[in-house]
Swiss-Prot record:
It is found in: Secreted. Its main location: secreted. Transmembrane segments: none annotated. Nv1 toxin seems to be encoded by 8 different genes. 4 of them code for identical precursors, whereas 4 others code for very similar precursors. In the genome draft, 6 additional loci are also correlated to Nv1 toxin, but they are not predicted to be functional genes. This high similarity may be explained by concerted evolution. The primary structure of the mature peptide is identical in 9 entries (AC B1NWS4, AC B1NWS1, AC B1NWR6, AC P0CH90, AC P0CH46, AC B1NWS8, AC A7SCE5, AC B1NWR7 and AC P0CH45). Additional information can be found in entry AC B1NWS4. GO terms for cellular component: extracellular region. Expressed in ectodermal glands and in clumps outside of the extodermal layer. Is not expressed in nematocytes. In adult female tissues, shows similar expression levels in mesenteries (gametes-producing tissue), tentacles, pharynx and physa. It comes from the Eukaryota. It comes from Nematostella vectensis (Starlet sea anemone). Belongs to the sea anemone sodium channel inhibitory toxin family. Type II subfamily. One of its GO terms (molecular function) is sodium channel regulator activity. The lineage of its organism: Eukaryota, Metazoa, Cnidaria, Anthozoa, Hexacorallia. Residues 21-36 form a propeptide. Keywords: Cleavage on pair of basic residues, Disulfide bond, Ion channel impairing toxin, Neurotoxin, Secreted, Signal, Toxin, Voltage-gated sodium channel impairing toxin. This is N.vectensis toxin 1 6. Gene3D superfamilies: Anthopleurin-A.
Length: 85
């Protein structure tokens, strides 16, 4: 029974290694596109005061906004910022 478990574990490892895909490197333009498509949308000050009708043009970034992005909310938060390009 122990040898059967060893065979199953070896097969599982073989499948895991065979199915692992190498991640391709992306250019900065592609990274900017993917960064803008991820995250949680947020309402910038320019979207208006009503959150229900706002277009949610910003994206929540943990910490602070990355280079090329600007903070679009007037309040200060230590944890995250609402940023847009």
């Amino acid at each position: 029974m122990a040898s059967f478990k060893i065979v199953i574990v070896c097969l599982a490892l073989l499948v895991a290694v065979a199915c692992a895909r190498r991640r391709d490197m992306m250019s900065d333009d592609e990274l900017d596109y993917h960064y803008s498509k991820r995250g949680i949308p947020c309402a910038c000050d320019s979207d208006g005061p009503d959150i229900r009708s706002a277009s949610l043009s910003g994206i929540v970034w943990m910490g602070s906004c990355p280079s090329g992005w600007k903070k679009c909310k007037s309040y200060y938060s230590i944890v995250a910022d609402c940023c847009n390009q």
